[in-house]
């Protein structure tokens, strides 16, 4: 019998590799399965690069299965070599603990921690921290061959540049995690990114050797790529975080709304819970009326609503619409700061009041002659209001919070002018 969940994951392109497709399908059809996905606390917030495996785990929860979210308070002290060309810098214990708390607090946004399919949050420091070196070598190291470990991509790719024994053993620690969750919670499936294949299969092999456990499975999801070859998960401002203090809901909305036509349908399949019928409708809209950007709006709205809630989404849309229309009066001073923090910044003297002198000093127009032309031609807007009077004086009323003024030149060129 075809499993509907696996069928949906295949359609979305979310299954990159799996250890035993037939065995996994059988257990998903006959029982409620417990699965897990791990996140190492490399920062005090997750970023959008963490989303895909976690959203895939959430899809299993939506279909009646039980997710375990593992935060690597133990493995985070070591550092995963997978996907890295250089040795990681070790974090302090205090930093790891702070990061564990920060990431743990974000899991409420992604998983449901109530009901029959309630998610569980665990920290592998709780069991890895209790294993002595002698126990590690006798109880676990004895079951893992060095040749087997050397054959894994995560290790092989590092041999030329060097890999420390610390990072070399990471694979065994993750294998211990899978075994622990299997014994304590009857967890049978691990989900991870494509770079986790070696770590996942090592866990399955360790369980087979130590406990004779053959009912354990692994799924990896694809690396998220963009059609233009650029790295996914970065904006011009840098990493796109899930913490609203690091990346505001407005910035998150802008990140997704700017998705290209070449990527948007794939990202709708990856990052939203919209069904096949709706995504196919959006794909048709993209082909027939690309200027409406309906697919991009659906992507941005669904992700921001899921991560930050309806209120934050509405604020993000309101800021976006106000900036697009130039109606800045609709925005608060904080929203203006938020919306314009990435535009060119300039400083002018508080004593400069004439509009021509003002826009020259701010570098908005290259000369007084150019400035006079810009003003006379209606190309200059002060806080969203067109100003064509060459004698206009910048007043206190133009200084938002007595701190800055938003100036627009032409249709789209914005500047934030501050006072000194």
Curated annotation (Swiss-Prot):
One of its GO terms (biological process) is tyrosyl-tRNA aminoacylation. It is an enzyme of class 6 (ligase). L-tyrosine binds at residues 36, 170, 174. InterPro entries: aa-tRNA-synth_I_CS, aa-tRNA-synth_Ic, Rossmann-like_a/b/a_fold, S4_RNA-bd, S4_RNA-bd_sf, SYY-like_C, Tyr-tRNA-ligase, Tyr-tRNA-ligase_bac-type. ATP binds at residue 234. The keyword Protein biosynthesis applies. PROSITE patterns: AA_TRNA_LIGASE_I (PS00178), S4 (PS50889). Homodimer. This is Tyrosine--tRNA ligase. The lineage of its organism: Bacteria, Bacillati, Bacillota, Bacilli, Bacillales.
């Amino acid at each position: 019998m075809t499993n509907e969940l696996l069928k949906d994951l295949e359609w979305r392109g979310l299954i990159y590799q799996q250890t035993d497709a037939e065995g996994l399908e059988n257990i998903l059809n006959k029982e409620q399965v417990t699965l897990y996905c791990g996140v190492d606390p490399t920062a005090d917030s997750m970023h959008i690069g963490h989303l895909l495996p976690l959203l895939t785990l959430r899809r299993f929860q939506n279909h009646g299965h039980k997710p375990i979210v593992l935060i690597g308070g133990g493995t985070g002290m070591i550092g995963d070599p997978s996907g890295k060309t250089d040795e990681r810098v070790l974090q302090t214990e205090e930093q790891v603990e702070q990061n564990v708390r920060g990431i743990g607090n974000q899991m409420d946004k992604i998983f449901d921690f109530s009901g029959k399919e309630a998610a569980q949050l665990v920290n592998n420091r709780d069991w890895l921290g209790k294993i002595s070196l002698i126990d590690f070598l006798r109880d676990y190291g004895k079951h893992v061959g060095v040749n087997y470990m050397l054959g894994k991509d995560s290790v092989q790719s590092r041999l030329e540049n060097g890999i420390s024994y610390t990072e070399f053993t990471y694979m065994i620690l993750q294998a211990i995690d899978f075994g622990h969750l299997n014994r304590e919670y009857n967890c049978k499936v691990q989900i991870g990114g494509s770079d986790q294949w070696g770590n996942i299969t090592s866990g399955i092999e360790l369980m087979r050797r130590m406990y004779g456990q053959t009912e354990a499975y692994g799924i990896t999801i694809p690396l998220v790529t963009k059609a233009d070859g650029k790295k996914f998960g970065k904006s011009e401002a840098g990493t796109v975080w899930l913490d609203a203090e690091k990346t505001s809901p407005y910035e998150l909305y802008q990140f997704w709304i700017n998705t290209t036509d070449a990527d948007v349908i794939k990202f709708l399949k990856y990052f939203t819970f919209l069904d096949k019928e709706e995504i196919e409708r959006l794909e048709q809209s993209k082909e027939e009326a690309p200027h409406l950007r309906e697919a991009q709006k659906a992507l941005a709205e669904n992700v921001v609503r899921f991560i930050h809630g309806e209120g934050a989404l509405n604020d993000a849309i309101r800021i976006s619409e106000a900036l697009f229309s130039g109606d800045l009066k609709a925005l608060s001073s904080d929203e203006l700061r938020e919306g314009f923090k990435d535009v060119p910044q300039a400083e002018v003297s508080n004593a400069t009041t004439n509009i021509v002198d003002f826009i020259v000093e701010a570098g908005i127009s290259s000369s007084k002659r150019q400035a006079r032309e810009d003003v006379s031609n209606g190309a200059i807007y002060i806080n969203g209001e067109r100003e064509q009077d060459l004698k206009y004086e910048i007043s206190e009323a133009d200084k938002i919070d007595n701190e800055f003024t938003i100036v627009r030149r032409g249709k789209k060129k914005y500047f934030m002018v501050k006072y000194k």
